[in-house]
Amino acid sequence: MRKDIHPAYQQVLFHDTNADVYFLIGSTIQTKQTKEYQGQVYPYVTLDISSASHPFYTGEVRQASNEGRVASFNKRFARFNRKS
């Protein structure tokens, strides 16, 4: 087996900025930023969204208002739907 062909696997600190939650996960990602967390320095990655802030995982229900769009579509194309 060849040596030095696999990327370096290390603990990386991911920060969900929306929920202000930190995750310490093993990863091969390479970063230029580092941050001290629980007394040790880790590579640092910021996230816009994760399982801590995504509506699907948090249980927040966001319904898109399609009724207005459907009504405007039907109004616009109602004249083509005439039955003879």
From Swiss-Prot:
GO terms for cellular component: ribonucleoprotein complex; ribosome. Coiled coil: none annotated. InterPro entries: Ribosomal_bL28/bL31-like_sf (IPR034704), Ribosomal_bL31 (IPR002150), Ribosomal_bL31_B (IPR027493), Ribosomal_bL31_sf (IPR042105). Gene3D superfamilies: Ribosomal protein L31 (4.10.830.30). GO terms for molecular function: structural constituent of ribosome. PROSITE patterns: RIBOSOMAL_L31 (PS01143). The keyword Cell division does not apply. One of its GO terms (biological process) is translation. SUPFAM superfamilies: L28p-like (SSF143800). Belongs to the bacterial ribosomal protein bL31 family. Type B subfamily. Part of the 50S ribosomal subunit. This is Large ribosomal subunit protein bL31B. It comes from Acinetobacter baumannii (strain ATCC 17978 / DSM 105126 / CIP 53.77 / LMG 1025 / NCDC KC755 / 5377).
